[in-house]
């Protein structure tokens, strides 16, 4: 039993155990326990667990000290104490009632008023009542009065606490107390004592079948789920009162203009966050927009070709803009552009040959923007026109030859035009440009036929020509001959070759940089193939010889022609057995060897097969490699 004296200081004493059977009865303070019998042993049981090797500390409350198994006051007088019990799980000191001892206690205060507890024992059913009918006198310093004050404080704490603790009706008589719990007197009914919110009941002390507990408690009667269930039910009731998303949609203002229905809520009020894919299709669904209300002023996102008011970009396929018109023809145009973009993957470029001249610059730009949807996006793309006003006012740019040539020949390997190379323009070319020249007559040439590229497999054989090695690997990989020099060739319509030195082409490029307002700069075409160090600058020469429009080198194996009449003139290598003509001698040699001749110079080293072309041999060697021959 824990009692409090008038002294507020706590004096710590050494752990002294004395085996004196006689206890001195001298008044040393306000309350001194006096043993009324003389045949009681001064030693009491001390039950310690095997896992706990730390002895119970000794504290002095007022002039009384608490130790296991003896207590001494301030004068080191041994006083019989209550039995202490320490468990290994929580190392808490368990205080048993002194009523279980078969001793008689005398309590005296400073006024010599004695109240005697005459050999009373509490019953095992925890009723908190004595067997005898002795009259009990309580003092202010008794634990009963202190417990009353503590209970009043707990009532105040319950009022201001956020969650009121619930009485546990299954508390046992011998509750294990933590150091933060208040001690109760042996006369107090423990069932009526409410647990404090600052109680430190450890979970292992409340669990049933505690192997380290030696107090003989019936822990099976404990119920730890009452408070948790009540708290869970209260929290669930709060969550059920939460307004769902369906009810929240009823209070949203109805715009009245958008007839799109809301998505049905099929999940709970708190959807799972793991189901989100963060996809754009969940937030933007332009195919579900309302198309019936043409007078709707609400801006919607559409994908249309840009007109003359926006800056054209090379190789751009679609350009999302914001418009007000939601009529059906725009969406028909969108479907047409999508189908046109998809048809571009079939590599059928014959439809570009039938382009007619438009009546205005704006319509020509629209036609160019529509045809640009069939091209792929370039690796290095820059705006073609930087200044719209200079484009509209400049007489040189009034002829849309440069735009049509750059848009219609971006990715077409067999088209009639290449990207414009303004770096090789000179002043005479720009000044002599005539507006009366019809640029779209050039577009009426038929597409090139029978154009075959040299594959890298030609390099497998030593019989391949030097031109084939030059076309596939570049000049850097072979030794150039003295006659092979860096020159800039001018290929005109009359099939005459004019050799322009490199210094003159460089001078024309420097002169072009001095006139930035006459033309727009175009980024060079970035190709995946290895570029040759020979600079080829084929230019288009018109019949009236008014000007020349240079074309950027295409970095490909064949040179395209423009005029159908001069189509065969650029193919000087004609086959003697048929009507086909070729631009390069190795192409003619390959044609004769594979079609008209039985020559098979490429033989397989693993079998007896021979081939007329090295690429066929390399394809055949793959079958041997698959079978594990090498």
UniProtKB/Swiss-Prot annotation:
It is found in: Cytoplasm; Nucleus. The modification N-acetylmethionine is found at residue 1. SMART domains: ZnF_C2H2. Residues 37-77, 115-137, 292-322, 360-379, 502-566 are annotated as: Disordered. A motif (9aaTAD) lies at residues 237-245. Keywords: Acetylation, Activator, Cytoplasm, DNA-binding, Metal-binding, Nucleus, Phosphoprotein, Repeat, Transcription, Transcription regulation, Zinc, Zinc-finger. GO terms for cellular component: cytosol; nucleus. Residues 292-303, 516-525, 532-547 have a biased composition (Polar residues). A zinc finger (C2H2-type) spans 573-596, 602-624. The modification Phosphothreonine is found at residue 479. Residues 37-56, 360-373, 504-515 have a biased composition (Low complexity). Transmembrane segments: none annotated. GO terms for biological process: cellular hypotonic response; cellular response to alkaline pH; cellular response to amino acid starvation; cellular response to arsenic-containing substance; cellular response to cold; cellular response to ethanol; cellular response to freezing; cellular response to glucose starvation. The keyword tRNA processing does not apply. It holds the Pfam family zf-C2H2. One of its GO terms (molecular function) is DNA-binding transcription factor activity, RNA polymerase II-specific. Positive transcriptional factor that acts as a component of the stress responsive system. Recognizes and binds to the stress response element (STRE) which is involved in the response to various forms of stress (heat, oxidative, osmotic, etc.). Involved in the regulation of the CTT1, DDR2, HSP12 genes. The 9aaTAD motif (residues 237 to 245) is a transactivation domain present in a large number of yeast and animal transcription factors. This is Zinc finger protein MSN4. It comes from Saccharomyces cerevisiae (strain ATCC 204508 / S288c) (Baker's yeast). The lineage of its organism: Eukaryota, Fungi, Dikarya, Ascomycota, Saccharomycotina. The gene is MSN4.
